[in-house]
Amino acid sequence: PEMSRGLGDVYKRQEGRLVMASADIGIDLGTASILVYVKGKGVVLKEPSVVAYDRDTNKIVAIGEEARLMLGRTPGNIVAIRPLRQGVISDYTITEKMLKYFIQKAVGRSYFGRRPRISVCVPSQVTEVEKKAVEDATYAAGARDVSIIEEPVAAAIGAGIDIYRPCGNMIVDIGGGTADIAVISLGGPVVSASIKVAGDDFDEAVVRFMRKKHNLLIGERTAEEIKIKIGTCLSLIHISEPTRHLRIS
């Protein structure tokens, strides 16, 4: 019910479509990457959820893509981390600074004079404490109002599905930290589950395989690149024309 009330404040019907109403900014605060949607402009920013900082001075060195390139390649005093784990905040202070940076980058420095309304999506079945942490971090980053939306609902709206119709729509949203599954009807999830197995676990599996099979130690960034390159199954499918037999290499 709380989530549905939040949706009512954020979205409205316009010519049979669901559109963002009162929120100025929509944020997909993902474990692996963050997307920022600005009303009237669409998705204006997509960058990795990575922050590099100097642990001697606690000063932020880089955020986003620049920080991702530092993963596994920094001197001892520079640490590149992901401040979110399995879809929830693991480092509140770093997440707050990261959010502030991305909001400012997406809409410009002038947003401090007109604080935006922001909707943020979170995994299904997160606790109230975890939701509150996201809400507080977003307010601290400069939001005037914050609405929390579950990721499958946000994915359904993004796909153009009318979530208020009296029919079931099954949504599977595989992210970096969680895989969220929900059946949505009449404005909200009827049943949902959040599995803490997703893209980051695939990366770790690649690292373990390379170490076990080839006695080769690779880093997180290389593992992600391998995952992306081998992640498309289309090139691995062969169809025999006479028999229509499907063979997967």
Segment roles from a protein language model:
Residues K12-I174, A182-S240, R247:
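Nucleotide/phosphate-binding catalytic cleft detector across ATP-hydrolyzing
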